[in-house]
Each structure stands twice: as structure tokens, then as C-alpha cells.
Amino acid sequence: MKANCFSRTPVATLVIMAIFSTPVIAADKKSQVINNFQVMTVTAPTSSPLTIISSPKTPRQPVPASDGSDYLKTIPGFSQIRNGGTNGDPVFRGMFGSRLRILTNNSEMLGACPSRMDAPSSYISPESFDLLTLTKGPQTVLWGPGNSAGTVRFEQERPYFEHADIKGTASALAASNDRWDVNADISMGNQLGYLRLTGNKSHANDYKDGDGHPVPSKWSKWNTDIALGWTPDEYTLLELTAGKGDGEARYAGRGMDGSQFKRDSLGLRIEKSNIGEVFDKFEANIYYNYADHVMDNYSLRSPSQMMGGHSGGHSTGHITGHMPMVSAKHSGHSMSMKMPMAMELDRKTVGGRMMGSWIWSDFELQSGADMQINTHRSKRNNQWNKDARFQDYGIFSELTWKATEQSSLISGARVDRVLVNKYASMNSAERTDTLPAGFIRFEHTLAEKPIMLYAGIGYTERFPDYWELFSPTYGPGGTHNVFNAVKSEKTRQLDIGAQYSGKQINGWISAYIGQVDNFILFRYDAHNARISQVDNINATIMGGEMGMSYQITDTWKTDASLAYAWGENTSDHHALPQMPPLETRLTLGWQKDKWSSTGLLRLVSRQGRIAINQGNVVGKDFDSSAGYAVFSANAAYQLNDYIKLSSGVDNLFDKTYSEHLNLAGNSGFGYSSEQPINELGRTFWAKLNVTF
């Protein structure tokens, strides 16, 4: 008999932990569009289908893990490649990796693992931030180069104080599989400045799938951050930030687990607004992010004789233990991992950005420059060895012309200079490139109807990232010189969309079609999954997202969303790999006074358009996938202006299913070489949110 129940946490403890752990919702216009009352099940655009803005603090269903990727999954168009219980890799519109830039407070945190065991999103604790903003496609140039799929920004807003005060929010979550999360975000200050403290801790044991089988997936994480701000007036800000974090995670789909995810962060930002009649605002920030990652096969599991599936590391990392050092890339699919082994790698990322805003007549210009330097190292014989350094220097401008009351024309351009060094004892090398990007978009709101329309075309070039240059065994044409052979991607994409905002009905649609030259593709050896070849092909992509909400009565409301992504390898005339299937979400919600309740039905079709043994540095297509339907439900009660209690059950009918984007389970846990990792079975959860 299957059983899934809460860890037995007394309600009093839950309340006390929530009250002494808390976040700040600052008084910004963007915050006002976020509705924190209900549990979020479908994320819809607020003003344009091109941009999604939501609050990471709002309870979500299905209840996400503690990392950024699982939160992004609640937005139509997003999916993830599952490793275990946490630290999945986000995918938007079928696009993966550095095609999707993920920023926190205008800084980038890059992981160290050559196979992305510690993806950038794994270092993000979403509830520490006030806003989550997604810009789809290459329709902005403000946030770095090569963002062909989109740009995701997690932001903390400046807390405002009219007098000496303390305020914040807190949350505590208890769920099946001994899940227990606490989050704190507290600000104190006055008109001249503030101190903001954020912290969180998250823990879960292995979950069970719908058949009651345990899936190796336990994790434990913590993060803490501090921000000290000086605000001599309402138009001036000088803020210093610092943060640390660590954790561990067990992975069903890898030959090693993550036993360390150390994070160190420093930042400084300056903002000055309302400067003059034309020069309106200046903002600048610099940051330092450091990731120190350890993976091993003994901290969270017992070393087994054979470890198939993803090894968790490649030749850029070095295995240490009671056996000679082995390069996982050349070790073969039947590499013996009976002996305890570990790999330690790190990455230091330093960057900065400055931008000015000018407003005159019907024009607004945003122009500036940014830069980033990141260095990757691996540890061998207790000594750090540098293997790669990436440098990027860019300038950018965006111009908005309010042509009429209903029409706007937005355009932008940027150019980046990239320098990459490969450090090796025998064949060190250097590459440089210049990357142009630009877009133009027309937006129009009908005069007599609540309909907004837009169409934009964008172009961007993306230099190969660390994982595409240093992780593969071979390069295009089978060359061993991967570093010099992989070309930069070039994406041309048309984005169109519309939004209708009525009294009872709201609807939106965003669609795209694009051509990608030199699309970077991984091909895996059919007999040895650790041997890979990276190649450049040409591809066509298209798809979109759409949604609708209908206010049936004052208390009843229904929402629906649909997302679809399609890709074709036009060089080889077959499907592009790692494309998520058609997905639909249907919700029916009820709200009256302080009570609310929602039912969510998630429908996913089968995916038969696959490219066997092709994919990216993390995942590959190894089989078609079946469709499924999963039903979840929740209820929430607003006790007063300060306390909200929500609870729910995910996968109510205990469905056994797996996502199409998936890692094959690891043989050390009893999985076959092409057996996907199943999703969570029935999961109960309860969450307490406190605001003061």
C-alpha cells in the first residue's frame, strides 16, 4: 500500500519559524501587479505577452523545489531536465544553456561542473527575491549577449521607509518526503538607509513515484545574504551586498552526487534618478560570484561496481580517491567506480554594468556598457589548475519612440567583444570574436478595444559557452580540436503576439519563428554515453504560448494556457532533439472573502519527434515519451492582513509518469541505460506566509 504523508511538524513550530524568518515587498509599480493572495498555478502576462512578471514569494502549484529551475517551470513555455529532486536545468521553448540568460540582481552566477550538475539556477533561492521577470526571445539587448531564447531576471527591490521601521515577510513549508523549508527576509531602516537580511534553508528526502518506488533525490541547502543601503534621498541609492550558501543533492540520473555547492557573492550598486529634464537616470553595479563545487560517489550513496548514465564529470575535472586519476571522458561506459572518488571544480565570475536613461519629448534612450570575466579551475593533487577564462565586453542602446497614444516603436543594438583562453600543458589556445545583436519591435494598442498587438524581429550571435567548448570528446567533423572548431550561433527570430484585457475575459498569445545558423548540437556514441561530439548544424524553430482567463462570477474563475515548441535540424532533415511536447494547463478557481481554492489539470501530449542520441551537454533523446494527465488542487485562507495559510496536494491520483526532457537513471541505483526518472507521486504540502 502506497503512503505519502507529511513529516510530523507541529503547527506551533511552523508558525514560530515563519514569524522569525521574513521578505520585503518594496513599493514599486511592478510589485503592484503581483497578486499574492492566491496560490499561483498559471502565470499570465501583466502588460505584454512578451514579458512575464511574477513574485517568487507567491505559493505555487505544483510545489517547486528550492532552486530557480523548478520555479520557472510554472511559467508556460518552460520545462526542465531532471537530475533528481532539485537542481534541474531549465529549458525555454526547447532552448537550453546559455541561450537563456539567468541573472540575479543584474549579476550572473555560473556553475563549475563540466556537465552542469550545478547549473546556474541551482544557486538561486527564488523566495529571496521580490520579482521574477522573463523577456522572451532576442527582444532586448540590455542584459548581455547571445540571449536567443530569452532573459530571466530575479530581482530584489529597494525597500522604502518613511520613518524608522522594520518590515518583512516569512514563509515555512512542510510537505511529503520529509520536505521542510523556511525562508526569511527582514528589512530595517529609515529615510537615510536600510539593512536587509535574507536567509533560507531547505531539506527533503528521496521522493516516491506513483508506483511507490523511491527515487534517489534527497537534498539539503541553505543561503544567507545581507544588503546595506544608503538612501540620502528618494532618488539616490548606494547598496553593498554579500552572500554565502552551500548544499548537497543526490542525483538519480548521474554517476556522482553533488556534495558541495558553496557560493560566495559580493556586489555594489549605485542608482541616481530624476537627475535632470533630459538625463533622467544613471545606474551601475559590479559583482563577484564564486562557485566551489564538489561531486563524489560516496557521501550520498555507496560506490557501486558499475555506474552507467551520466558520469557527472568530464575531462576538465579530475577524479581523486583510492585509485589512479581517471579522465571520465575517455574512461568508457563501463568505467569502474567501485572505489570512492571525488572531483572539485570552481568558477570565479566578476562583472559590471552601467547604464544611463535619457527622456525627451516622445523618446526614451537607454544606453550603457557591461563586462564579465569568468575563470574556471579544477583541482588535482590538492592544487588548483586553471583551464579556461572567458572575457566579454559589450556596449548597448535601446530606443523607445512613443509615436502616438496607441503606438510605440522599440529598437536596440549591441556589440560584444569576446576573448577566450584555453590553458593546457601542451596545447594552450586563444579565441576572439565580435558579436553583433539587434532588434526592432512595433507595439500598438487599439483605440476603442482593449487589445494590444506587437511584432518584432531580432538577431543575436552567441559564442560557444564553457560546456560546449570543453566538455565534448570531439568537435565538428570528428576533430580533437574542439576549442577552435565550434562556431558561434547566429539566430534570426520573428516574435509576434497579442493581448486582450476585458472585464470578464482576458486572453494572450505569443508566437515565434526563427532560423539558427551553426546551432550547437551534441551527438552521443550509441555504445558509450561518455563519448560525445559537438557539431554545428542549421535549424528552424517555431512555437508559442497562449492563455485565457474567464471570470465566470464574482467568486469563480477559470484559466487555461498552452505551450508548444517545434524544431527541425535542416542540415540533416530530421527533428531537433530535446524539444518538449505540447502542454496545456487548465484551472478552475474559487475565491470568497478570505478563502480561495483552485484545481489544476496539466495535460502533456506524447513526443514522437526525436533525434536518438542527440541533445546537449546534459541530456539527449533516448526514446519517445508517452502523454499524461496530472491533477492537483489547493486551498488558501487569509487569516488577516499579515498571515496566509495555503495547502494542497500535487498529483492527486498518484500518477506514474516521466517528463520527456529527462536524464536516464543511473545504473548504480538499478536503472537501465534508457530508463527515465519518474516524477513525484502524490505529494501533500502546506505553506505559511507571514508579512509584517
Where are these regions (language model features)?
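Short acidic/polar hinge/loop motifs at secondary-structure boundaries
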Residues: 108-136
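N-terminal periplasmic accessory domains that precede
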Residues: 59-62, 66-72, 88-91, 103, ...
